Regions:
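Terminal targeting signals and extreme-terminal segments of soluble enzymes
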Residues: 1-108
């Protein structure tokens, strides 16, 4: 990936997407086919039991996937289908880190 593309994607992933800012998500690293996105757990991200809300976890993964794809295909992408298995809870005060990795880049 060129430095220009890296810089553009970092701006997009941190400064130009209102949903990410609203939910405290930050793109922290990009490489060809990978993207690292972090989420410091705030009260607004928790469910009524004090764990991370499933929707915010799914969104974190979705953002990492989309950013990883954009390192390889310089166009906007959308998720058509996704599945997630929740293995354990994340608590307030923790920071979650997810790495999206492209295994296979499909066609258009």
């Amino acid at each position: 990936m060129t430095k220009d593309l890296y810089d553009k994607l970092m701006v997009f992933g941190n400064d130009r997407e209102p949903f990410l800012a609203h939910n405290f998500m930050r793109t922290t690293d990009l490489d060809d086919g990978t993207a690292t996105v972090t989420l410091p757990m705030h009260t607004e991200s928790l469910n009524r039991w004090g764990g991370a809300h499933g929707g915010i976890l799914f969104s974190l993964c979705d953002v990492a996937m989309g950013m990883a794809i954009m390192t390889l295909r310089q166009e906007m992408v959308v998720t058509v289908n996704a599945t997630i298995d929740y293995l354990s809870a994340a608590a307030a005060g923790s920071t979650l880190t997810t790495v999206g990795k492209v295994d296979r880049l499909g066609g258009k």
